[in-house]
């Protein structure tokens, strides 16, 4: 239920994190205030910044810097971990290889997924079977990113406990069969900026990433502090800039949470246009449901106050696989 929002709220989630695993968290005034803010943000914009998340700013920067160093390597070096179907669509994509709604995106990226072993999810998971392809250069890459994924997973789980309360359920609503064994996706993305050719500004890229919604439950975006590029569309169709706020994550709602909330929470369209001269790095962590979970509106949201519309059931793994199989060219 998006609105004509003109800015994106900043939420201090430290009171929620302090009590996130307390059986009585729903009775804590500090938690309830955060829950109220989460509910408002998810209902009105589908986007919000979080501060007080516990990640040192030095770690956020290190993750971006290591990613940037990889993208500065030669194509031949980067292609050593080239994405292939045999790797479960994990690895490096060159500029223009990712497709959004049929149009090449002007970014390069490394795609990582929770690793899927043979027959882990039966036929449902065949496409995603494989291990992540981590660069050997920089040498710290694999250890740093695996630690970062673990921290992001824990943070997202705790935010989802607050969102569960906001939806009128128990804090455990998105654990167990829904997201007790969550799948995850991480994209490390580089967006070239504007170059100067013959004294005239020429865009190497038009749309760094075309307008889209995210697939899962909750997204955590760690973006460069000095480049405005992310834009979010409000109900009137206006594109609202989501400028970097140092030390924060940008969070947004995915398609699966929209279904769980029966449309109360919006998986809002967003895009990236880098009109800056600087190369932009973003590291995006996607917290998902269990891979084989059948997602349908929560019992508390099957009858909507403003009508009887109900979102249809979707199996997350099918939803993800369908997107992955149409997102790339020349693979």
UniProtKB/Swiss-Prot annotation:
Cellular component aspect of the GO annotation? cytosol
Enzyme Commission number(s) of this protein: 1.14.11.-
Report keywords, A-Z: Cytoplasm, Dioxygenase, Iron, Metal-binding, Oxidoreductase
User: Per its UniProt entry, which superkingdom is the organism in?
Assistant: Eukaryota
Tell me the Pfam families matching this sequence: 2OG-FeII_Oxy, DIOX_N
List of residues binding 2-oxoglutarate? 280
Q: Which InterPro entries match?
A: DIOX_N, IPNS-like_FE2OG_OXY, IPNS-like_sf, Iron_ascorbate_oxido_reductase, Oxoglu/Fe-dep_dioxygenase_dom
Q: Write out the annotated subcellular location.
A: Cytoplasm, Cytosol
List ligand-binding residues for Fe cation: 212, 214, 270
This protein's name = Homoarginine-6-hydroxylase 2-ODD-C23
